Amino acid sequence: MIKAILTDIEGTTTPISFVKDVLFPYSYEKIEEFVKNNLQNPQVQKIIEDVKKEINKSDASLEEVIENLKSWIVEDKKITPLKELQGLIWEEGYKSGKLQGFVYPDAYNKLKEWFDSGIKIFIYSSGSVKAQKLLFSNTNYGDLNYLFSGYFDTNIGNKKDKQSYVKIAKEIGFSPSEILFLSDNPDEIIAAASAGYNVIRLVRPLDADHIDNFPYKQVESFDEIEIGRV
């Protein structure tokens, strides 16, 4: 019996285009100004040091740090200090009203239905927990954070690593067989399934394609997901 949902965001609850065409360009445009204006912020200081560790250059200049961060955005690298910095930048954007999150109508309706029925819902995204909460705090359906019992990012592990899903199951207190994982990424689906999760792959028409002979269920919309039939 499914007692918990663990869902991805990008390409699952939210269009990839929102992340790629709205959030990423916004952070790229603002990153240099934000870092230079917040050098006294302990969080920013730690991010700068983490970038230096990531590139194995402890004496890297601020300009080198910023250029690496910009390159990682362009290359869509899932690197923790970048994701944490993007979260801080997006926070300013959401608070100023320049950014608003977007959630698919079918995702909103199903998430609310599951929440109302007592199923616990958790988020697992490569974006930082801060960025996840920000996206859902200001959406086309208002603040949706009340729907979620917890959030996970790459601090718990890589999304394509079986052990990440083992850790999450322990953390939320459900056995893998009681959890349904939703994602558009086939490698993440396979990793979660190998940890014993129930899995369904989202194939949004504009974001992904059906994979022939894929060993797990694929759907185009949350409307096709019936918990009792998983």
Swiss-Prot record:
* Top EC group: hydrolase
Instruction: Enumerate the catalysed reactions.
Output: 5-methylsulfanyl-2,3-dioxopentyl phosphate + H2O = 1,2-dihydroxy-5-(methylsulfanyl)pent-1-en-3-one + phosphate
Tell me which positions the record assigns to the signal sequence: none
Q: What domain of life does the UniProt record list for this protein's source? A: Bacteria
Q: Single Gene Ontology BP term?
A: L-methionine salvage from methylthioadenosine
InterPro entries from the xrefs? Enolase-ppase_E1, HAD-like_sf, HAD-SF_hydro_IA, HAD_sf
Q: In what pathway does it function?
A: Amino-acid biosynthesis; L-methionine biosynthesis via salvage pathway; L-methionine from S-methyl-5-thio-alpha-D-ribose 1-phosphate: step 3/6; Amino-acid biosynthesis; L-methionine biosynthesis via salvage pathway; L-methionine from S-methyl-5-thio-alpha-D-ribose 1-phosphate: step 4/6
CDD domains per record: HAD_EP (cd01629)
Q: What is its EC number?
A: 3.1.3.77
Disulphide-bonded residues: none
Which keywords are on file for this protein? Amino-acid biosynthesis, Hydrolase, Magnesium, Metal-binding, Methionine biosynthesis
Q: Name one GO molecular function term.
A: 2,3-diketo-5-methylthiopentyl-1-phosphate enolase activity
Q: How is the cofactor bound?
A: Binds 1 Mg(2+) ion per subunit.
Q: Name one Pfam family in it.
A: Hydrolase
Q: Which cofactor does it need?
A: Mg(2+)
Q: Which family does it belong to?
A: Belongs to the HAD-like hydrolase superfamily. MasA/MtnC family.
Which NCBIfam families does the UniProt record give?
Answer: enolase-ppase, HAD-SF-IA-v1
HAMAP family membership: Salvage_MtnC
Q: How does it assemble?
A: Monomer.
What does the record give as the function of this protein? Answer: Bifunctional enzyme that catalyzes the enolization of 2,3-diketo-5-methylthiopentyl-1-phosphate (DK-MTP-1-P) into the intermediate 2-hydroxy-3-keto-5-methylthiopentenyl-1-phosphate (HK-MTPenyl-1-P), which is then dephosphorylated to form the acireductone 1,2-dihydroxy-3-keto-5-methylthiopentene (DHK-MTPene).
This chain's protein is named Enolase-phosphatase E1
Q: Which gene encodes it?
A: mtnC
